[in-house]
A protein has these predicted regions:
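Short, cysteine-centered beta-strand-loop-beta hairpins and adjacent loop/turn segments enriched
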Residues: 74-76, 94-99, 158-165
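A short, terminal or domain-edge coil/loop segment
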Residues: 84-106, 178-196
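Extended, charge-rich C-terminal regions with high alpha-helical propensity
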Residues: 140-196
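Extracellular/virion structural assembly segments
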Residues: 10-11, 16, 80-84, 92-118
Length: 196
């Protein structure tokens, strides 16, 4: 059986991928580039447990994950589907080369904000960014992991009927499952290797 076609029109996947590709040259760098991170990628799946963050940050001094949170309004203009999308970019950093994680996170957050509010930013979007905001997501549990996290949120109109090259997406090879039956009970963990 061959892999079936998957029509992504009407989704925010293309917009997120465009934002990631725009931010990569601005924010990705080597370990000694303290105002940059190791990876900029589209945020997918749950990411609300300390173990998830710790696993993703392993062997990284920092990273940025971009996600669409919601589409607040849809419209058709010239036969195209346009959506007003609320985005978030999470900035993760660790202490590096004697510089604190908190300082690095603030600096990288500032670079991210400056790059998306530039007049020529995100040329494939339908509109300029609006309602840009950044927040320090400090809490004791995250601090114990040795990580600082900031978020940058904004709204922007994007075409939602763009097709994406499915070959550009990560392969869906494994499916991980963690089931919680009740509080303080052992979890059910599993990993399934999917046929390709």
């Amino acid at each position: 059986m061959s892999r079936p076609d998957f029509n992504t029109a009407g989704s925010t996947v293309w917009a997120c991928e465009e934002i990631v590709q725009y931010l990569k040259p601005v924010l990705e760098g080597q370990e000694n580039e303290l105002d940059k991170v190791a990876a900029v990628e589209r945020h997918i799946g749950r990411f609300d447990k300390a173990e998830d963050i710790k696993r993703w940050m392993a062997r990284r001094g920092g990273g940025v994950r971009v996600a669409a949170l919601r589409v607040t309004e849809y419209d058709t203009i010239g036969g195209r589907l346009i959506g007003n999308v609320n985005f978030v970019a999470y900035v993760f950093t660790t202490d590096q080369w004697g510089y604190t994680k908190d300082t690095r996170a603030e600096v990288i957050t500032g670079r991210l904000v400056r790059s998306i509010i530039d007049r020529n930013a995100l040329p494939t979007a339908y509109s300029q960014v609006a309602n840009v905001r950044s927040d320090n997501l400090y809490n004791g549990q995250i601090d114990e992991l040795g990580i600082a996290i900031w978020s940058v949120t904004w709204s922007q109109q994007w075409y939602l009927d763009e097709e994406i090259d499915l070959g550009s997406l990560d392969d869906f090879i494994t499916f991980g499952l963690r089931g919680e039956i009740e509080n303080d009970a052992p979890t059910i963990d599993g990993e399934v290797h999917l046929p390709q």
